[in-house]
Amino acid sequence: MRTPHLPEAIATRKYFDREFDRQAIKLLPNEYYVTGEDVVLTTVLGSCVAACIRDEKAGVGGMNHFMLPDDEGGTADRMLSASMRYGCYALEVLINELLKMGARRERLEAKVFGGGAVLANMTTLNIGDRNADFVLRYLKTEEIRVAAQDLRGPHARRVSYFPVTGLALVRRLTRQDDQVSVERDERALARAIATSGTAPSRGGELFTRASASRTPS
């Protein structure tokens, strides 16, 4: 079986966020960002998941945004060799970049979000559940403490993460237009992964300022 190419891109979309009165970085699918600056990292998640990981003592933190490849019709070996390797890579890139900036593995804490049922009808196994299960299992295996989580459920989410303080704000996107937009983009992402064995290094624009319910983590 062909080994999938596993690109992971540093997020480059920066803007000034008036709501939080600071510099912000938008993460698209298959992107990550690590920093020690007082900025906000934002992303929108449907079935995808984001891991927000920091070392409080080192003062560095980061976020990623990824989706496991669809293994519908595949064997268990294929799932381990493709999907699991893909997810491990996405998290290892984030963790390794944190370590390069002075973080210590034993001090890392994580907050994880996403895994919604946005693409529930795409396979017999909900992609969101699989993404959520994977990220929790990975962090447990790596002995990284999960300080907070908001996973699964029917809605897409907008996550705002402040890596210096560790604060994470989650808005559930309940408007039908937002749900449809996220579902459309994530279906395209899932098809791209299934077709090529990888995700594009730049995903579609998923971000919205629409009103939505909001909960801190």
From Swiss-Prot:
An example molecular function term from Gene Ontology annotations: protein-glutamine glutaminase activity
- Decide whether keyword ATP-binding is in the record: no
Renumbered residue ranges of the record's region Disordered:
194-217
InterPro entries annotated for this entry?
Answer: CheD-like_sf, Chemorcpt_Glu_NH3ase_CheD, Cytotoxic_necrot_fac-like_cat
Q: Which GO terms describe its biological process?
A: chemotaxis
What EC number(s) does this enzyme carry? Answer: 3.5.1.44
Reactions the enzyme catalyzes = L-glutaminyl-[protein] + H2O = L-glutamyl-[protein] + NH4(+)
Note whether tRNA processing occurs among the keywords. Answer: no
The family assignment reads: Belongs to the CheD family.
Q: What is this protein called?
A: Probable chemoreceptor glutamine deamidase CheD
